[in-house]
Amino acid sequence: MHKQLPVICVAAGIVLLAACTNDGGQQQTTVAPQPAVCNGPTVEISGAEPRYEPLNPTANQDYQRDGKSYKIVQDPSRFSQAGLAAIYDAEPGSNLTASGEMFDPMQLTAAHPTLPIPSYARITNLANGRMIVVRINDRGLYGTDRVISLSRAAADRLNTSNNTKVRIDPIIVAPDGSLSGPGMACTTVAKQTYALPPRPDLSGGMGSASSAPAQPQGDVLPVSNSTLKSDDTTGAPVSSSGFLGAPTTLAPGVLEGNEPTPAPQTAPVSAPVTAPATATPVSAPAAAAPVSAPVSAPAAAASGRFVVQVGAVSDQTRAQQYQQRLSQQFSVPGRVIQNGAVWRIQLGPFASKAEASALQQRLQTEAQLQSFIASAQ
């Protein structure tokens, strides 16, 4: 009797082990990972904007398919998965998703066998490090070695193929909108906006619109050479007669045909004194007018409605170096904007969305960089 006891114990252990593995567990990670902890720099990612949504009552029940059992993930905070990704590329409107929505390949969505519907997850392309947020709104895949099926838009953003391995990290959205879960480790989610700036005030606003170019015209005044003091030696040629009709070199930003304007350019020359002096003389401070013209031009060029954001990092120095390199490579202005613990790297601003889109295309084709357009603030 005592000799048979070990045999019975071993047999019982085998039965228990088989019961633990015959559960469709291959669809989830074998060992539930611990809640993710950030030990590196924080990065800002884009994609579907997570928002609180009640779970679909019909799409979150345990089920069986093709002889396999699938258990819906009850605690996404302890779930993570890595494996090959498929591309779900059906025609728009051809079928409904498990959430009851019409499938749209241009939305950043995905299908997963066991994650809650609807829910959100951070998807990382393990080959190139790209990350986006997708919305889980469908079930699948079945009968393959793929762990998730991405929409065409999501696959293009991640630059995945049928042989690309990805990592799935859920993002949990609380009723108050706060985000947590493995997908938020070392990550902040960018809130994209394509809102246009407020409409200009047209009730008498025409005067304000014309005031910008009118200012430099009012500042450009004739100057008496007797009071002008300047160290600039790049003015008009010495051969200039100084007569109002004589050709002279125009200062930057000065309109041709404004005859009193060339007077400051002849200041370094002693010959043209009498003719400009006969014009309406003004005090010496007006000599600063030619300087204000070139300064106002870059200020106007730097204003715009749209910027192209290429990334965000937690190190300000790295962000500035990256922005300067991109600005030099693509010959566009740029800036680094702080947003909490991260520094956003933005190129622009641009006056129109078409200009920003053109830069987006160049970033994609020439540098293989993902970006998105946001309104300049």
From Swiss-Prot:
Q: So which residues are the signal peptide here?
A: 1-19
Q: Does the keyword Disulfide bond apply?
A: no
This protein's superkingdom? Bacteria
Q: What's a Gene Ontology MF term here?
A: peptidoglycan binding
Its membrane topology: Lipid-anchor
Give the enzyme's EC designation: 4.2.2.-
GO cellular component term, pick one: cell outer membrane
> Which GO biological process annotations does it have?
cell wall organization; peptidoglycan metabolic process
Q: Which residues form the SPOR domain?
A: 300-376
| Pfam families attached to this UniProt entry | DPBB_1, SPOR
Q: Give the UniProt family note.
A: Belongs to the RlpA family.
Question: What's this protein's function?
Answer: Lytic transglycosylase with a strong preference for naked glycan strands that lack stem peptides.
User: What is the name attached to this protein's record?
Assistant: Endolytic peptidoglycan transglycosylase RlpA
Species this chain originates from: Salmonella typhi
